[in-house]
């Protein structure tokens, strides 16, 4: 029986993580979780799983939950997130919160020697050097939950990582993969939220449409697997059947395939190095699919992917700037305050405005994050 703490239980990854726990009640126990403002959902999860600690975003929601929570301790805010991440009984902390708020709980959980199931892209993007140093220092495993990084992780199982020639990350292309730049001037929020393959939260769905999601994954892969950016490629693969590939020195390529279902990589992170049945996911029948398609990525068509490579290669504090600018811009687009292509423009402005700090401390990263958010808000 593995004890699980779940950060971000009401989001897309969080709800699917609970599906996995639900499927294997003899294997997993939920000891703590956090939610944002979805209190009705939190009540249902408490009633089903009886966790010991639950964290909410706002102090005013604490009393609402305490009235129905029985013996569950209710906490709130950033301190509450840390309490969930540091639950003494938790063996695995699944970080499924959205945004850079996931950074500090991850670092503290690593220091407490918890195994980390990492679905929060921004943690490695903004502070990859700090996270990986801490993981090495405390001998902690970072297990990828993203389908692409899980695919690479599985392809590398038993392999000599020094023999890697290239990582090939696949991209569905998002909601607007078939639209021209001119057509993108007129797309709506509703259009952007219709992802062709995956069921995800609103922020990551917009990131998929701009291709920033894939850019964040490139930076994540660099840190997780220690591969230079020059050896990480992205290929457009509309079917989302091949989740990623690894090319070795002898030019052999290993790929991980499967139906697009996030519960598969989530469960693998929780069961690693073992596997368990996942009976209600769709079996992959290649004869039904028939043909798989691949296209080279156009980084002028998908400018956010180019920004991510530029930020990653610049290193230091630049990825944190790019990430903070993107979070503010995406939120403004979702609120219909800016157009779709303005997201790219705001990110570019923020990156051009910033002078890179080569090895920023945690405090500097948090300061840069806040300053970038203020700068971008002033541009809107």
UniProtKB/Swiss-Prot annotation:
Keywords: Isoprene biosynthesis, Manganese, Metal-binding, NADP, Oxidoreductase. Gene3D superfamilies: 1.10.1740.10, NAD(P)-binding Rossmann-like Domain (3.40.50.720). Pathway: Isoprenoid biosynthesis; isopentenyl diphosphate biosynthesis via DXP pathway; isopentenyl diphosphate from 1-deoxy-D-xylulose 5-phosphate: step 1/6. GO terms for molecular function: 1-deoxy-D-xylulose-5-phosphate reductoisomerase activity; manganese ion binding; NADPH binding. One of its GO terms (biological process) is isopentenyl diphosphate biosynthetic process, methylerythritol 4-phosphate pathway involved in terpenoid biosynthetic process. 1-deoxy-D-xylulose 5-phosphate binds at residues 121, 147-148, 172, 195, 208, 213-214, 217. The keyword Manganese applies. Its EC number is 1.1.1.267. Mn(2+) binds at residues 146, 148, 217. Belongs to the DXR family. Catalyzes the NADPH-dependent rearrangement and reduction of 1-deoxy-D-xylulose-5-phosphate (DXP) to 2-C-methyl-D-erythritol 4-phosphate (MEP). PANTHER family: 1-DEOXY-D-XYLULOSE 5-PHOSPHATE REDUCTOISOMERASE, 1-DEOXY-D-XYLULOSE 5-PHOSPHATE REDUCTOISOMERASE, CHLOROPLASTIC. This is 1-deoxy-D-xylulose 5-phosphate reductoisomerase 2. The gene is dxr2.
């Amino acid at each position: 029986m593995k004890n699980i703490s779940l950060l971000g239980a009401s989001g897309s990854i969080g709800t699917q993580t609970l599906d996995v726990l639900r499927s294997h009640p003899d294997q997993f126990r939920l000891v703590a979780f956090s939610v944002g403002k979805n209190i009705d959902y939190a009540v249902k999860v408490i009633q089903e799983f009886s966790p010991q600690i639950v964290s909410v975003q706002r102090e005013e929601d604490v009393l609402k939950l305490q009235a129905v929570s029985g013996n569950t301790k209710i906490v709130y805010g950033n301190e509450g997130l840390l309490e969930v991440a540091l639950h003494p009984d938790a063996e695995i902390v699944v970080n499924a919160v959205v945004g850079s708020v996931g950074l500090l709980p991850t670092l503290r959980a690593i220091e407490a020697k918890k195994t980390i199931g990492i679905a929060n892209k921004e943690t490695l993007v903004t502070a990859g050097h700090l996270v990986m140093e801490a993981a090495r220092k405390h001998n902690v495993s970072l297990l990828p939950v993203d389908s692409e990084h899980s695919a690479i992780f599985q392809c590398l199982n038993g392999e000599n990582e020094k023999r890697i020639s290239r990582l090939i990350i696949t991209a569905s292309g998002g909601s607007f993969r078939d639209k021209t730049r001119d057509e993108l001037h007129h797309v709506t929020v509703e259009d952007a939220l219709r992802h062709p393959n995956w069921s995800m939260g609103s922020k990551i769905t917009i990131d998929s449409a701009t291709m920033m999601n894939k850019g964040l994954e490139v930076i994540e892969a660099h840190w997780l697997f220690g591969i230079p950016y020059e050896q990480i490629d992205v290929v457009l693969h509309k079917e989302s059947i091949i989740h990623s590939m690894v090319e070795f020195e002898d030019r052999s390529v290993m790929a991980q395939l499967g139906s697009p279902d996030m519960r598969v990589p989530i469960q693998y992170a929780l069961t690693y190095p073992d596997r368990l049945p996942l009976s209600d996911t769709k079996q992959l029948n290649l004869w039904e699919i028939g043909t798989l398609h691949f296209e080279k990525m156009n980084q002028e068509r998908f400018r956010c992917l180019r920004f991510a490579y530029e930020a990653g290669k610049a290193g230091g504090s630049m990825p944190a700037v790019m990430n903070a600018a993107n979070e503010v811009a995406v939120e403004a687009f979702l609120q219909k305050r800016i157009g779709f292509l303005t997201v790219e423009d705001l990110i570019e402005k923020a990156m051009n405005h910033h002078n890179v700090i080569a090895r920023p401390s945690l405090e500097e990263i948090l300061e840069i994050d806040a300053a970038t958010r203020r700068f971008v808000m002033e541009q809107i």
